[in-house]
């Protein structure tokens, strides 16, 4: 989840738009628009041991994991869900984004936990599985700095992103 500190790139104008999962608090410096609902899935490389057989919470927790987290975080919501079952996973790598997590999982025995729809194309050729424990659904949002609200080109771009996400969801 993106924290208040993550609005720096938008505020500085280094980026115009960002998509991602946001927490319950967002900076007043960031405008958001819901793009779609999503759910977390586990992802491993083809041929990984988890690609065979039933995936229990115990098997999932026993693997080596890559965590997507922002600064100063070394656990995520998955760790809370596992702890409720008396389980703990081993996080061997922490990265700042889902693309990096999937790249690591594709070339190793690491397990990535990522949003299903948000990473659909990035997971091609990998083995994806439903998580063996209850995780709340999440919302993927579009974010931008308020100074861009009235910019016609930026409004057009935001509209294109919203339309593309809606079309992709309606197709499957």
PLM features per residue range, with description:
Residues 1-26, 95:
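Central regulatory/effector-binding core of bacterial HTH transcription factors
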Residues 31-41, 111-119, 124-139:
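Short beta-strand->loop
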């Amino acid at each position: 989840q993106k924290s208040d500190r993550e609005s720096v790139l938008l505020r500085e104008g280094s980026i115009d738009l960002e998509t991602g999962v946001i927490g319950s608090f967002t900076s007043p410096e960031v405008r958001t628009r819901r793009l779609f609902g999503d759910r977390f899935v586990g992802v491993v490389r083809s041929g990984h041991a988890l690609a065979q057989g039933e995936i229990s919470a115990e098997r999932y927790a026993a693997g080596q994991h890559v965590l997507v987290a922002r600064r100063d975080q070394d656990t995520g919501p998955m760790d809370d869900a596992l702890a409720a079952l008396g389980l703990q996973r081993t996080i061997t790598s922490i990265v700042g984004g889902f693309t990096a997590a999937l790249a690591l999982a594709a070339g190793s025995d690491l397990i990535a936990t990522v949003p299903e729809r948000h990473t659909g194309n990035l997971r091609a050729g990998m083995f994806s599985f439903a998580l063996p424990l209850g995780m709340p659904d999440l919302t993927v949002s579009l974010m931008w700095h308020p100074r861009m609200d009235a910019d016609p080109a930026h409004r057009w771009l935001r509209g294109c992103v919203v339309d593309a996400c809606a079309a992709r969801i309606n197709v499957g």
